[in-house]
Amino acid sequence: MILTTSRKPSQRTRSFARDLERTLNIPYVQRGKLSLKEIFEIDKHVLLIGEFKANPGTLVVYDVENEKRLSSFISVKLQREICGEKIYNDDGIRIKISRELKDNEEFQKYYEIYDEFLFQHLNINEDSDITLRLEKDPKYLFAIQFYKGRVKIGPLIRIKSIKLFDSLL
């Protein structure tokens, strides 16, 4: 899986992309003038960060092999806003679900979608220091928060809505 942004990302969107690159330990490709087709030739699974009013506003996961895409409207908090420093992840990531969400049937549908499109393509390592935790958020469907041990390191991604499409474009 690779990470990229819209064509001319704002500074905040670039910072968010770099935060995800460091915490998820996946390569970030600067888009420049590359078309989506050229990006799809680099990797079959692409995580694209789109913008809304110069902020990261959408998270689109492309599954090129199955010609599907998952689009989510998001709200974010950067690493520097949460812990004030850059945290690097050299190995995989551990995924945990909060207790409130484990029993929620509606959340299970969202989790299965995200697992198919995103989580299965990450480097999962149960012994990792870095944890991707899915948490309940009162205003949103759910939130994705990153921890190192028990300390929040960010970025925080709040998922507002999820849509599935049967075409890449």
Curated annotation (Swiss-Prot):
Disulfide-bond pairs as recorded: none
Upper taxonomic lineage: Archaea, Methanobacteriati, Methanobacteriota, Methanomada group, Methanococci
Transmembrane annotation, as ranges: none
Keywords tagged on the record: Ribosome biogenesis
Gene3D superfamilies the record matches: Probable brix-domain ribosomal biogenesis protein
Entry protein name: Probable Brix domain-containing ribosomal biogenesis protein
Record keyword Transferase present: no
Record function comment: Probably involved in the biogenesis of the ribosome.
Organism: Methanocaldococcus jannaschii (strain ATCC 43067 / DSM 2661 / JAL-1 / JCM 10045 / NBRC 100440) (Methanococcus jannaschii)
Top-rank taxon: Archaea
